[in-house]
Every structure is written in C-alpha cells, then in structure tokens.
Amino acid sequence: MGRRAHISDADLTAAAGRVCARLGPGRATIDTIAREAGVPVGSVYHRTDSRTALLAEVWIAAAQVFGNEFLMKLQDARSLDTAAEVALVTPRFTRTDHAGGVVLLAHRRDDFLEGAPDEARARAARLSSDLQKGLTDAARRLLPDDKRGREKMAVALIGIPYGAVRVFLPQATPPAELDPVILAATMAALTH
C-alpha cells in the first residue's frame, strides 16, 4: 500500500500560484513552493514532472477560473448593458483570487509557459482561443451592424478592465469603488 499524499495537485498549484504572485514566476523555486505548501520538496517532485510544468499549471488554473466566469457571463449577455457587466469579472476576480489575478494580469503568459510541455501549451492556447471566440460571437450577436464590433468588445471587456486593475496589481487589490468607473468606460466603448 502506498503512502498517503501530502498534498493534492490543486493545493500544490494554488501554493505555487501564491509564490508566483508574491515573487514572480522567475523566482518561484521548487523549494519556495514546497515551503508555501508546507510539504517536503520530494512531495512537490512527486506531484509534478518539473518546475516548468508546475508553472504552466499555475497559469492554466488561473486562466480557467477567470475564463469560465468571463465566458459564462458573456454568453448570457443579451444586451450591451449586460455585456458591459462582463467587464466587472476582471476586478472581481482579482479581489476573490488575488494571486490568480496577479498571475494573469501582472505577468506575461510566456513567463509561465516558456519551455512548458506541449500538452500544457496546447491547453493554454485553447483557453485563449475560447476567449477570443467568445468575444467574436458576442460582437456578432450584440453589435451585428458594427464593422468594428469585435474591436469594441475587446477594448471594452478586456482592455478597459485590464488597464484599471493593472494600476493596483501586484501590490494591492483593486477596490470595489473602481467598478462603476470600469462600467461607465466600458459602456462608452461599446456605444461609441
């Protein structure tokens, strides 16, 4: 009978995400991740093929949580008003998962995926592709006569909230008082 696992894959990825948010992915070593997780270094190596593979999982995990919420709200949007609400997924995500927000919004994707296994890179590419497809579909549905509808959706739902929260990250969490400002700017971008 094998020994009981010291840590789950999800808990290890979360610990690695916290280290990456605090120190940056370049300084996230297996030793610092093991300390954050409260497990021996050997337990980390037992759970992952390599540091590179673990960092890829950190980005993918954050992108999945964010992307699932973003796409669910975007697919449910039936008006520009409800589409504008999708922009609030970004600041709310950074408030509920500060480490995930820092991973996605304060670092480059390639900082986590460079040298990653092909399978992880393919999963990350699918997540990005799904987000782009969601924006395209929303533009066709909500701005059907606007030749620049796709651009407007991208600026309004990605660019504006990203710029607003990036002012605070990684050191601080964007305050809730920022949400009405993001919403107003998003509506302006969608309607002009």
Predicted regions and their residues:
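Hydrophobic/aromatic residues within well-ordered alpha-helical segments
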Residues: 58, 62, 66, 90, ...
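N-terminal intrinsically disordered/low-complexity leader segments
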Residues: 1-7, 18
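Hydrophobic alpha-helical connector segments
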Residues: 57, 71-99, 154
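Hydrophobic alpha-helical segments that form the core
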Residues: 91-92, 132-137, 145-170, 175-189
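Short hydrophobic clusters on alpha-helical segments that form packing/core surfaces
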Residues: 12-20, 62, 66, 90, ...
